Structures are given as C-alpha cells and as structure tokens.
Curated annotation (Swiss-Prot):
Matches recorded under SMART domains: FN3
Region described as Disordered: 400-442, 459-1108, 1120-1227, 1330-1401
Entry GO terms, CC: cell-cell junction; cytoplasm; extracellular region; mitochondrial membrane; plasma membrane
Annotated InterPro entries: FN3_dom, FN3_sf, Ig-like_fold, TARSH/FNDC1_C
Signal peptide, first to last residue: 1-29
Gene it is expressed from: Fndc1
Entry protein name: Fibronectin type III domain-containing protein 1
Record-level GO BP terms: cellular response to hypoxia; positive regulation of cardiac muscle cell apoptotic process; positive regulation of protein phosphorylation; regulation of protein transport
Amino acid sequence: MAPEARASPRLLLRAALLLLAALLPVASSAGPPVDHPLKPRHVKLLSANMGLKVTWDPPKDATSRPVEHYNIAYGKSLKSLKSIKVNAETHSFLIKDVEKEVPNKPLRMRVRASDDRLSVAWKAPRLSGAKSPRRSRGFLLGYGESGRKMNYVPLTRDERSHEIKKLASESVYVVSLQSTNSQGQSQPVYRAALTKRKNAEEDELDVPEDISVRVMSSQSVLVAWVDPLVEKQKRVVASRQYTVRYREKGESARWDYKQVSNRRALVDSLIPDTVYEFAVRISQGERDGKWSASVFQRTPESAPTTAPENLRVWPVNGKPTVVTVSWDALPESEGKVKEYILSYAPALKPFGAKSLTFSGHTTSALVDGLQPGERYLFKIRATNRRGQGPHSKAFIVAIPTTSSTEASVQPNGRDNGKPEKPQQPSSSAPKVAASSQHMPPAKNVKDALSDLKNKIQTNGVAPGRTQLHSKVGELDPQSTEVTGEEELDSLENPRSSRLETLNQKQPLRVPSRSGHGALAPGRTPARAGLPVLSRKEGMDRRGPSLDPHPHPRVEPSASSAYHQLSSTDNDSVDRKEDDQAGSPDPKAASSGSSPKNPGRSRPTSAPSRHAASNMLRDKSRVHPGTKAASSSTSRQSHSSTSEEDSSAQPSRHFPLHRGSSTSPLSRGWKDRQDTHASSSHTTSRTASSSHPSALTEGSEEEDGGADSDRAAEDTIRRAEATAQIQQTRPGLGHFSLIRNKPFTPHSRNPNRFPRLRGPRLQPSVSPQSTSASKVLTRSPSLPASHTRPGSDVYGDGEDEEPLPATVINDRTPSYPRHPISGSSDTLRRGPQRGASLYRKEPIPENSKAAGADVPPGGRSPLSSKAQGFQQSTTDEGAPQTSPASTSRQPSPARPPASRSQPSPGSTVPRRMTPDRSSELSSSQSKDRSLSQPKLSVAHAGHDHPHTANSRGVLPSAPQNQNEGAQSTYEDNSTEIEGPDSRTPTHSARAKDTTPPILKPRQVGSQSWSSDNRPQPSQAGASERPIRPGSTHPRAQVPGRAGVQATSVKKVSPSKRPLPLESQQSVFAEEEEENEGMLKGKEDSLSTSVKKWPSSSSPRDKYADRNLDKDKAAIGLLVQEENTVPGRRPPGSPAIASHPSTRHQPRNPATASPIANTHSWPRYTTRAPSSYSSTTPMLSLRQRMQRRFRTPVSRQPPPPRPVLTPGYNGRPNAEENIPPGSIGKPNGQRIINGPQGTKWVVDLDRGLVLNAEGRYLQDSHGNPLRVRLGGDGRTIVDLGGTPMVSPDGLPLFGQGRHGKPVASAQDKPILSLGGKPLVGLEVVRTTTQVPTTTMPPSTTTTTVPPTTTLPPTTTTTRRTTTTRRTTTTRRPTTTTRATRRTTTTTTTPEPTTPSPTCPPGTLEHRDEAGNLIMGSNGIPECYPEEDDFSGLEIDTALPTEEDYVVYDDDYGLETTRPPTSTMPSTTAATPKVVPEQGTVSSFPEEEFDLAGKRRFVAPYVTYLSKDPAAPCSLTDALDHFQVESLDELIPNDLTKNDLPPQHAPRNITVVAMEGCHSFVIVDWNKAIPGDVVTGYLVYSASYEDFIRNKWSTQTSSVTHLPIENLKPNTRYYFKVQAKNPHGYGPVSPSVSFVTESDNPLLVVRPPGGEPIWIPFAFKHDPGYTDCHGRQYVKRTWYKKFVGVVLCNSLRYKIYLSDNLKDTFYSIGDSWGRGEDHCQFVDSHLDGRTGPQSYVEALPTIQGYYRQYRQEPVSFGHIGFGTPYYYVGWYECGVSIPGKW
C-alpha cells in the first residue's frame, strides 16, 4: 500500500482532500444540540492491493457525543463524489473501485504438459503498476478439455506460475489466463496442451514374489524378494519403494514396518527363538501395492542376552565363611536356561575368581569357604544350550571377620601352607567340604568343580585345554572328564563327604594336589577343577602329610585357596572352558577332587588307582580347584601351593600344568619360608604320589595316542604298584597325570586318561616309595610309563604339581630337605613362572637352589645356572623332598628338574644324573620316536636335580627349543605342583628360568606335544616325556619354584601376567596339540614353544622380567649345554645344545628342555627349534612359527625341513607325527587355515584356534563357536553352518572379515595417526631381546636374540621377537604405533630378517638350515604341500608379539605368539616382506607408470605392492584392522543423549601404488566420551567439490574404501561421526590426487602367455551395483575369473559353463558386495550366502572342492555328503600360478 501511495501522489492527495471534507461523523440526537460536527482525527489515505484504504481515529469528544456512523465521500473531483456510510465501530475502510480501466492481459504464457498435469507460467501485464489506471489486482486461470466447461482458479497478483494436477492422460486441454482488477478482467490468453500417455505404473502395482527370509543371527533376518517389474527386465523405477512388515506369529501381535529402496531388508532387534510373520508390498509415488502372502520364519535360539537380575548376597548367621546368594530367574524369552554360573572373587584379588554352576531351576545357593574380613564381588550369568549370557552387575559383600583360622586359611593358599599340614587340610577341607555339605552332593561336587574351574580360568589355564580334556573324558572312559563326571555322579555324595572328610583329614595334601591340579588345568582345567584339587590336596598332604595324614583331604580348601591364587590366572580360562564344557566339567572337577580324596584315604591299590584316575581326570579339571586345595594344604603344601599357584597360572596357557604350577608357586613363594620344612614334606609326599601319575600322564600325552597310552599303562602299572605302596599317594600320581594331560593333546584323548588313571596311581605310589632316582631308573625301563610320571611331573606335571610330589619322594632318598625347601620356594614361584619375570628374580634363588640341587643331583650337565636352578629347586624343595633327584623319579624330583630346566636352560641338564640323563635320553629318543618322547626327557630328568633339569631340558632339546620352552613352562607348572609333593627347588629354578615364557609356552607345547608326543616334555609335551623318564622334567617346576622363591615378592605380579600367558599358552597348547597331531610332533612342539616365549616374553613387565629370567635360563642352558653337550639329555644348555640337541634328539631331550627354557626366556623360538632334533615336533613348530607370524598356522608342514639339521633351527631328527597320531582326535581337529597356515578346531571348547592358541572371532569379536556336524565329521557353527569340511578344510570366508580380528597373515597392519591396534594379533614394532641374565647362581649367559645358539645347537631360528602385545595385556600393551609393521622373516641369519617365500610355498634351506637364495637374492621356494606353508617363515614378528585373548571366559592374557623362527635376529624391527607389502608415508616409486609424480602429503600413506600383481582392494584392506563391534558400538547408548561432539581426527588417505581406482580413507576413533555408532564419509571430485556436491558412504569402522576413482584426478574427503542422537561436526576435508592409469593392465610376459584375457560380461543390477570387465586366467580350476568391478580387481571363481552368462555379485553374509573371493555356491545358483541349517541342504549335483587350491570337482553335495556346498576361495591370498 505504501508503495502504491507513493506511486500516485496526485491521485491520493486529491482523493485525500476530498475524503477529508467528506468524512463527517453523524452525532446522535441525544443530548444538548451541538452546532459543529464531530471531526475524526488522524485521517489517513493509503494505497492497498485492491484499492485505497482510509483509516482514522474517533473524535475527541466521542465519549460525550457518541458517534452513530461515519460518511466517506470520495471521487476524482468534488463534482463526482460517491459516499459510503460506515458504522461507528469501524476505523478503516477499503475503497476498491478506484481503478480507471480493466488491466492489460498477461504476457508470455507457457504451458507444459506431463502425463497427468499441466504447468502454466506467465509474465505480468504491461502497465500494471500502482500508478497505472490499468493495474492488475490478480489473475484468473481457467482450464478444461476442449469443447467442455472450463474450470477457473483465482490467483493472486504476485503469482507467475501454477500447476494443474489430476488431469486425464492423452487429452487436449485449453488453458486461459486473465488479469483482474476492480474494473473487471482483461482479455484472456489461450493455450492448448496435450497431456502425455500414462505409464504402465498407472496399472495396479505388482505384488512381490519369491519372498525369502534368511536367518542372519538369533535377532536378525534378511528378507529378500523379487520385484516382477524388475524381473521382467523392464527399467528400474527410481521412485519404487518397498515396505516389509513383520510381527510375532499371532493375530493380536502388532505389525512393525521397515521401508527400503532395494529388494532386501535386514530386520533386526527380533526376539530369539520366536516365529515371525513377514510380508512385503511395493510402493511408488503415492500409491501402495498389495501385501504379499506372509512368510513365517523362526529365529534361532541364542545365548541369553541379559543377565539374571536382582543378584543378592548376604551372610549366613553363625557361619562367617558362608553366604547365601539369590537371583531372579531369567525370563523365558531368553530361552530355556541350562545353568547359572555364579562367579565370585575377592575384591582385591580379581584373579582369584571362582565360579559355581547351578541348574537352570536354581535361584539361590550357599557359597562356602570365603575368607573372613575379605570383600567379595559376586556376578552371575545364565547359559542355555546356545551359550553363555552376559555377567550381571557385580554385587559386593564383606565377609565378617572371624577368629577362625580355618576361614582365613582356606582362601589363602599360603596361610594354609604355613599351618601344620593337617591344620591346613582341615582348613581346606572345610572349604571344600563345606561347599559339598552345603550343597547337594552333586551340586557340591559341581560347585567345587566349578570353583576349581573358575580358579583355573582365573589362573590363566586355557579353557580350551581343560575343555578338551573334559570332553575327551566324556568321550573316553579313560579321559579325565568322563571319569570325573562318572565319579562325580557316582561319588557325588560319597565323594563330597569323602572330600570333606579327607579334606579335614588331609588338608595339607590338598595343596600339593592342588598344585598338581593347577598344572592339570592346562590340560583339562575345567575337569581338573575340583577333583584335581582333591587329588592334589591328597598328593600334597600325602607328600609331607601323606605319611602323617593321608586323609587330610580337607586340603581341598587349601586347594581352593590355591585355586584362588592360581585362579586369578587359571580360573577365568578354566571357567570359560568349564562354561563351555557345561556343568559336567564342574561336576567332573568336583567329582575328581572327591575321588582324589577317596583315593588318598583308600589304602587299597585299586581304590588308589581309581582315585588316581579320578584325580587324574579331576586334576586336569580341578586345576583351579587344585589351587584351592593347595591353599588349604597350606604349606605342606606351601611350596606345593606356590607351585600349584604357578601351575595354575600356567594352566591358563596349559590348562593343568600351568595352572597347577602357578598356584603352587605363588603359594610357595608366599609361604615360602614357612613351607621350607613343610614343603619338603609336601614335596616328598607329593612327589611319590604325584610323580607316578605325572609320569603316566606325561608319557601318555607325550607319546601321542599310542605312546601316551603305552606310557600311561606302564605308568599305571608302576603307579599301581606304587599305589599299593602309597595308597594315598595315588591321588597325587593321578593328579600329576592330569597335569600332563593338559599339556599333551593325548592327555586330552580319552584313551590317555584311563591309562593315566592307572599309571598315575601307581606312579604316585612308586615315586613315593622310591626315590627320584628309582623312578628315573624306572623311567628308562618304562619309557612311556616312566616318562609319564617324569613327564607327568615334567610336562603335565609341571602344571600338575604331582611331579613335585614325586620330588617329595625323591627328597626322601637323596635331596636335602633344604633343597626341597627351595623347591617349595620354587613352587611358590611357580605361579610366577607363568610370568616369566619371576623367573628372573628367582634366578638368584635358583642359582642358590641350583647349586644345592646340582650338588645333590650331581648333575653337572646343567650349567652352573642350571645347577643353581636345580639346587634352588632342591633347596627350596628340600624340606619337601629332600631327595630331589629321587624325587625326580617321583613327581617331586621331577618338578625340581622341571623348574630347573625352565629356569636356566641349564635346567635341561638339570637333575638328570648322567645315567639318568642317558636313561632319559634313551627313553626320550624312544619316546620321541613314539611320541616325541616325553619319556626321554623325563628319564633325563628323573634321577637328580640334574636329571630334573635334564628332564626339563630334555623335552626341549629333542623336540625343539620352542617346545623346550614350552616344556619349561610346563615343567614350571609341574614343578610348581612338584614343590608341593616334591622339591620346589627345581620348580623355582625352572620357573626362574622359564616362568614367563615357559608357562605360556608349556601349554602350547603340551598341546603340540600331543602332536609330537615325544616333545611334550620339551615344550610342555616335552615336559611330560621328561616326567615319565624321571621327575626331573618336573624338576623344572621346582626350578620355577626356585625362581619363585627367589622372587617371592615378585610372585604376585608374575602371577598376574602368568594368567594371561597361561591362557595364551593354553590356547597355543591346544592348538599346537591339534596341529601337532596333524603336522607332526615336532612341528607342533615348535609352534607351541615359540608361542610360549612370545606369550611370556617381555611383552609385559612381568613377561619382560620373565624374559630376562628366561634369557638367563637360556644362558644357563647354553652354558650347561656347552659344559655337557654330550650329556644334553641330563642338562645340556637349551640354546647351546639346541643344535647338538638336534643331532642328539633323544639324548639332548634333557638339554633340549633347558634350551627351551632359555630360548623361551630369550624369546628365541629358534632355540627350541634346535631342540628339534631331540624334539622334532618342536622344531617343526618352530619352523612353522618362523614361517608364520602365528606359529599355529605354521604347524602344518613338519615333514619337509624337519630332517635338515639347520633348517630353521630344527634338528635333522625332527620327526613328524602323522596326522593320525593326533593327541585328541575327538577333541581337536587341525585344518588348513588361510595362506597355508594350520588352524585347530577345538571341539571341547567349541573354538577355532590358530597356532598361537587364539580363537577365531565372529563379526562381534566374540569367539566363533563351533560343534560337530550331523555326519560326525563336519564342523559347523552353532547355527549349523558348516565351518570345516570332513577333510579339515575351512568353509568360512578367508577375506578380511573371515579371519580373526587381527592383521592379515603377512601384511603389516596400518596404525594411522597413532591409532592403537587391537585384535588377536597386535604387532609390536620393537622386539625385545629374549636374552636375560638368569638370576640363579649359575652364570647366566645372556644370549641376545640376534646371537645364534652355540654352534653345537642348531641356530635358534628366532626372528626378532617383536611382540605383538595386545591391548589387554596389562604389563605392556604395545600398540602397533608404527605405520609400517614389518614382520621379520625367520631366516637362519640372526640379525637380519630375511625375505620370505610367497604364501603357499616354502623356502629351501641347506643342511645348515640357511635359506638357499636364488641369483636374484630371493629365496628359493618349493610348493607348500610339503611341510609348511611359506607363510610360516614370513613373519617372525607376530610370532613374538603378544596376543590378547578377547573372550571374557578365557583369561584376558596377552599371549605372545611363538617367537619367530629367526635364529637370533636382532630384536628387531620386523621387516615387511615385499609380498606382504610395505606401508609408508612416501611411495616407493616417486613417479607413477605414466611418469607423473605421485601425490605426497602428511596425511597420505602408500601401500606398496608387487608391480606385477594386479590392484586388489581386498589385499589393501588386509592392512586394516577389523574392529569388533564391542569396540565400535558402546554398550550403553543411554548414558549420553547428545550427538557426537567432536569431528573424527587424523584423517589419512591410504593409496596403493600403481592403483588409481581406489583409496582407503582412515581416521581415528572419536574422542573418549563421544558415543559414536558409525561414520559418514564424504567424497567429491574437484568439480563436485567446487559445486559442493558430495557423495556419502557410511562406515561402522574407522576406515572406508572409496572406489571408482578416475585416474589423475583430485578428490576431497571428509568424515563425520554419528550416533542415534544425531550427527557430529564434519572434519576438515583432505585432498588427494590419484595417479595415472596403468596402460599395461593386460600384458604379455616374455614367455608370451597371456596373463589375462579380458572380455565383457553381463551383470544383473539386482545382484550387484558394480559392472565392468572380467579377466580370465588359465588355471587348474574349471574357470578362474578375475573380475574388475568398480575399477578394482577382485577375484572370483566362476563356475558357469558360459563365461558370458550373467554375473551375480559374490555375496557376503548380507547377500551383496563383491568383496569376498569364493566359489559360487552351487545350492544358490550363484547367489552365495550362509545357510541357516546345514540339515536343510538337499543333496544335489554341484561343484565342490576338497582342498585349498585344488581343482573344483563336480558331484553330490549337500547334507549327508562330505561337502555341504562349495567353500570359499581365500581372498587376498595370491592366486596359484604366476600373475
């Protein structure tokens, strides 16, 4: 209005004047007459859209003279005025008829037609402004079909366009437009338009067809369907949408909806085990189609997703050590609860956790045996048949203090040790008994077992091993589990009461037993849980208390206390195993402990035997419990306890051995002073009972199936005889056996356990009655059996403490009590042993002990150090087992030897008397041949401290340094246990020598040992062999104990690391065991050994400490070896004698263990390799490790280089164990992993493990659970999807998502922007020199990792031991900080990493073990079919790196992968093999192929590749870590309702040289505190960047590949974080210029053979978003196709007969994406994906492949056949043939 007023001032002015004159109010007649009219005030005239607006205010005196109305007169002159009356309430008026003329017509009218609408646009008329008399006030739009009535639409004066909708298609419409004002309308403007023909979309929308619902998980399904419109190959309609509706089955359920734009939808957040109804409809625009017919699908049952609520704990009146626990039952929606697992631990001792298992109907329970004055944390979780649920929130309860010593003693293994043995037993007994009494017998046993299990887990016992044992037990009556279970059931009540009574009667024994049990957990920690405790308790009590109170089985309390100690390390692992095993495991454990008690109490040989066997079974199982028992046992068992503790910790790695060892050690060192005296008693007692059983077990395990069994039988016979002599002892013996078992796969085997039972009892008796020397003597005669005892003592025994028990016997004959005392200390150290560091500290003590031991043993073979270790063991264990050497024969002697051996390596010579050594040696060679004779080792270690040392050494030397190291650990464990029964001295020493490395290693070794039966003694398995031969291998345990004694204070720290290491060991062992079985003992051992060092090497401070000790031990060993090279079996230096060991595989067995010990400490896996001659398995393993970062994978090809004396440090005599000799055929299967590596499928634990014992993870970072398929041969996941074919081939993807969360095998992981690396394998770029000076008095020769072992021994092929520390490791979590992770290849050369052969091939080595290089400086390689895959050598680095085990149930310990095979390379920087590719901020070549300079910036990282290799995004992504969802998605999204507050940092562009088509954008995680569930990655080319047009992609991890990039083009990238509450800030953008295109993609090599033949192919957009070219390569496959998709080369096998057929994307689990290489699934016609249940697969004709890189075959596939469907092709693995 204002503008218009200005526009026509004259008109307005004039009108205003006229209006003012005419605007007159008319007053009412009321009131006095007034002469003058009322004048309105503030009259204004304004221009409006439709005319003139007049406004005014009422007159001043309007109140006194009310206004009736206003008159408005207006006109262009006073002559032509018009007047209007307005009522009195109005103060404004609009005058409309003020225009002069009608407006002009609109201009430039245009009409555009579509199918059902017209768009009209125009310009304003001329002269339509406010001044114009023809101004327009609006428009009138008319439209209608020609010849019909028009429809009119008024429009405002400002509109210039309009759309007419809902018109008929294919019709002619007339459109008119007029402008209007107050004078009228302008002339119309007409236009005619024809609407277009409507599309078929007008027809009714199609109904989706072929709706399929694929189960993705228990809570998500993938719904897919076919759109008939798209299927008819019509065009794809962009506006087409699809809606999926779903609800629980039932009419009353509410529908939920999900709308998507593609033809598949992932429906998540479903309820497990529920039937859902699904339907789909198509929508387009505003129209919706009809719903399809419903499809029903049941979601599979899943593990509970919630924890039981309302956990409450309160004390029981009048019972200060008892609490009542109650909880709410889990809702039915979580599935039928099978059992509840209650975990509790002292608040200040988180590793002392125990767990009890209750039936699914139970909601309350009594928990007994708590420590007064302690604060306990209680947690509970539920399990159903699909797995375990999460833990509940912790409930903390303070136990009231009480004057009762019992209560306090029970929890403390140490306190128990201090009191008189009987007192402790009673204390222990109350604990165990109480639990039994308070619960129903079954429940009690079960609880006790679970407690033990928990302890074992806590102590780091590998659940896998335990579980294996338990499973084996279940399968085979002989196996510990079956026996344990049966006994549990049958003896549940009796046993319970018996346990209680026994515990009361023989509390001290329990510790000793416990120690053994701790050892046992490595093997079958779960089963060992309680039974081991009992047995161990019995053993311990029997050892010292055995004579006085055979009954004080009450020890179980002590044992449980020990368990607590050890449980820190073992329990978690064992618990996991137990959990996996289920309640049976706990049951077995408790039953085992019960039988043990009965066995002890029973005088008859038969009962003893039974008890022994039970104990054996139990031992492995009770390991944790054993610990507890040891605790109770207090210090008869103090040393015993220590030993057990240490053993238990080792147990984590080595189910029983380690745990047992750890427990006794920790206990021992704690109560060390107290225990010296009682220790000697315990040792003596334990030794006799422990040794035989250990012997039996060791031999059984070591030998593999047959050897083990044979040894077990022999041992049993002896044990029986002995059992009769020492009825109570048998339990010990059994316990020993059990310990051994965990280390050897065989021990897992069902047949092993039965034998073990008999022999254990007998050996127990025998050792008790006989001195170590006697046992040793027997050992030769009874190689397997004797070895078993010795071996048991040594290998399993290490974990077991039975060997120490045997030592006790020994101490009776020859060792001074004070040495036994040392043993005790060593035992205490045992727990430390797990953490090698303790070894260092104990070394001084060890040296003292060693000195004492050596003099008693007279086994000079050990270097002064070794002797020191021995002596230390003997000294410490002297009180326990005065005759350390004698004790060797029994468990006690052996533990000292065991420890000795681990401790310096001199331990190898350790307690073996020269004759003993020879015996051992001969035995060992025998065993080795049989089963990597643990026997030999045992023999070597039987007689004297030397023997013990040699025994410890023996296994190592013969089999492998690796194995030796493992065996050392095992020995440590054994010793730990041994200290209880026998001399902790050895234990300490061995422990000192190899606690850190050995412990973890032992487990692996034991595992491998099964493969290399002979080798168990050496590396765990190796220990066993020693054990059988003599207790000396056990002596190693004492060595550890010695170490512990020396480092009593360190024990606690050591213990902690130990658990982790133990756990690692367990995994490694387990894997090794399987692997070893398939690959060969040597190989297996080698891996395990290697594994050990890495796990215990200075990954953490403890590990470092251990490393030092190990180094020292190694030095000792080397010295000893040098001193007594010929005598190697008795005590040759681990390192020095390794080469010689190789030459003298059998004899050097003793030395070998020593070497192992050293080598472990030094982290020179190679050293163990040299042992390989003695222990072929070890060398094999070493080789594998060398080859592979993850030694486990290395295992597969033992045969080829085994015989070469210098091959990778393996001895020539390296023996391969035929696949058939697998220790536990039922429990583990070895399969071919990616890149020629070997993986172990552990059916007992339901895991897939690599050589390091790490388990394969699912997409959530949890262990991938597997089970046996319907045909009894195929391995499937819990959903029934086949994972491993009956022939041992993995069927799961080997792409970057199919591997464990870790780096690709030989590819460095990028750590960009300082991002920490997490995963199974985290590589430490800095490698620690393994050499450490040994604390023992023996001079320790530190052997730098770079130095090769003495010439006599084969070069230790240890690559630099770069440890991969997992973030979980507390001591030192090293993240791979360097961008460039280099793996050192293990080459004979000590200092420099050498080039490695490509995957699938192996390097050639000369007789000296040196790489044979071609003229071009590249190693000569041969096909992988041979012994190992080429990868084994490739990365030594991972071998040494620490690995973290992620599963909660398993101990969270970083295990160091086996040390690389590089003999003694400088610690070093791993070198990236060209094949693996290097990572650098600068390209290797400054210019690209077109001569253009490559783009360089601070945020750009280049990956190098072989110029001849194609560009593969798959390969590039292998450099990136796949993070688990646990890390990516926070647990509690509700704690923060804000969007991310910070932009992603450190954005890095990773490019591959020579590849322009893709880059990978990487960035750092969000700032802590920001809740981030995903990221948006923006990318734009330069042109798009200028126009601010960005493409976005989502990523759930911190890197994303950007594909389809053009050559020589600048791109910009930025990243934004998001969460459910919104998006965070966007990061600054970074730019990158791609390199020029490669004009030589398809080339003809000099030979003229076309590498690729390109041609186009059809593609179906419904299955793939990518299209492109495919390059066909001639291979032995039917058709091999490399497909260039999205400009990035991918690989696929195309099985179509016609290569021009339609290409379907290679589906991943979502059914989309081309990122996986695999064979096309014959069942899905090219659309690959997982099957919900294998049983649902029909039998049809299809393609399948049996072995990796084998031609595809055609035949019957499906359920019921060996081939369910075609497996995956390994992505990222170089394709066979030349590229």
